[in-house]
C-alpha cells in the first residue's frame, strides 16, 4: 500500500522546514513554497517557478495540497457571504465573509458542531462531531481567498481580519488551532497582524493558559451573564470553570499579550428579559471592574426553535448607558447577514440537521457491526 501523502496545508513554518530538512533541502525552500501557497494560492507544484524541477518532483511524490471545497454560498443584501465548506464524510462547516468600508473579516470554524451546548446558540444545539484539522481551518481562508480572487482585483475586498468565532470552541481544539493561527500570522503565510486575528472562547481556562504560552492574538471572551447562576444555564461550561476562574484566566492572558493592548473584548448576547435589565448591567459592570475590557453587546439573532427573543433597542440602550456610566467602552454590534442565517449564533442551519442524520447513520452502522461480530 502506498504511503499517505503529506498535506502541506497542515504544516506551519516550523513543520514545513522540518519536512524540507528531511528531504535534504534548505529552510528557505520551505519559505518559498509557503509564499506560493498563501500569497498566490498556487496548488500545482509545476507552477512554482522558483523551485527547481527535482524538488518539485520530490514534493509531488511525497506531498499534496488539499483544502476543503466550497459546497455552496449565499450572499446577503448587506454584502455578507456565508459559505458551506465540505470537510468530508457528509460533514460541512460554515464560514462567513463580512466586508466593511475599511476591512473584510472572515469568521472561521474550528470544529464540526460544538460540545458546549450554549442554550442561545444554534451551533450549540447541533451537538459535537469532531475537531477540524489544520488544513481544514486554514483551508477555509484559502478557499474563500480563491473565491475572492486572491491577488486579483475582483471587486471584493480581500480578507484583512480573521475571527475564530465560527462553529466550535477553539480552545477545545488547540492542537490544530495554534498551528493554524501560526500560519495566519506568518509573513510567509497569510501575513495577518496579531491584532487582526481574534480567538473567541467561552472559558476553557486551562487551555486559555496554554494559548497564552504559545501565541499572542486578540482575545474575545463570551461572558453573556453577570453571575454564575444565570451563566450556568446560558453557558453550561461555567459549571466547570465559573466566572471567577474565567476572569482570572483572562487577566493572566492580558498580562502576557501585546495583541490586546491591555484589554480584551467581552461578548454579551442581549436576550429579552433574560440578561438585559439595568440591574444586571450594574451587576456586569461590578463583575468586570478588575478585568480591563471593552464590552460588545450583541443583539440576539433568533433561529428556528430558539427559546429566546432579541432584546428591544430601548432595553439595549438602557443597558449600554449603565455600563458607560462605569467608564466602559461599549459597542452594540451591528447585525450582519441575518437574512441568510449568517449572524452571530445562527451558524449551523441545515448543516445541523445533516450532522444529526450522519450521527444517526453511524449509530446504526455501529449497531449492525456489533450484531455481526
Swiss-Prot record:
Keyword Zinc annotated: no
Keywords, alphabetical: 4Fe-4S, Cytoplasm, Disulfide bond, Iron, Iron-sulfur, Metal-binding, Methyltransferase, rRNA processing, S-adenosyl-L-methionine, Transferase, tRNA processing
Any Gene Ontology CC annotation: cytoplasm
Domain of life: Bacteria
Subcellular location: Cytoplasm
Active site: 94, 344
UniProt enzyme class: transferase
Keyword Ribonucleoprotein: no
Residues annotated as binding [4Fe-4S] cluster: 114, 118, 121
InterPro entries named in the record: Aldolase_TIM (IPR013785), Methyltransferase_A (IPR040072), RlmN_N (IPR048641), RNA_MTrfase_RlmN (IPR027492), rRNA_lsu_MTrfase_RlmN/Cfr (IPR004383), rSAM (IPR007197)
Location (main, coarse): cytoplasm
Sequence positions that bind S-adenosyl-L-methionine: 168-169, 200, 222-224, 301
Cofactor note: Binds 1 [4Fe-4S] cluster. The cluster is coordinated with 3 cysteines and an exchangeable S-adenosyl-L-methionine.
An example Gene Ontology biological process: rRNA base methylation
HAMAP family: RNA_methyltr_RlmN
Miscellaneous note of the record: Reaction proceeds by a ping-pong mechanism involving intermediate methylation of a conserved cysteine residue.
Family: Belongs to the radical SAM superfamily. RlmN family.
Protein name: Dual-specificity RNA methyltransferase RlmN
Organism of this sequence: Shewanella baltica (strain OS185)
